[in-house]
């Protein structure tokens, strides 16, 4: 199980507990921190996907914007 899976699992556990009986202050603080971590991981993964994206037109020609190509060259993706 990856770290992201563990974070997601713990968030879900805290959500269920909150629905059933409520959370203590410590648990609420943990939930907020886990949520921040989850969002940061999601954004990083999404940015990585966008950075590695190549856009191709109907004829198969690479029409990726120059700015995206520059980022890809810096990260040695091209």
Curated annotation (Swiss-Prot):
Disulfide bonds: none annotated. GO terms for cellular component: cytoplasm. InterPro entries: DUF896. It holds the Pfam family DUF896. Its main location: cytoplasm. PANTHER family: UPF0291 PROTEIN CBO2609/CLC_2481, UPF0291 PROTEIN YNZC. This is UPF0291 protein LBUL_1264.
């Amino acid at each position: 199980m990856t770290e992201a899976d563990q974070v997601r699992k713990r968030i879900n556990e805290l959500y269920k507990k909150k629905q059933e009986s409520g959370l203590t202050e410590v648990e609420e603080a943990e939930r907020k921190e886990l949520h921040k971590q989850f969002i940061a991981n999601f954004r990083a993964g999404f940015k990585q996907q966008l950075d590695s994206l190549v856009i191709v037109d109907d004829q198969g020609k690479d029409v990726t914007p120059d700015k995206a190509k520059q980022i890809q060259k810096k990260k040695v993706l091209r």
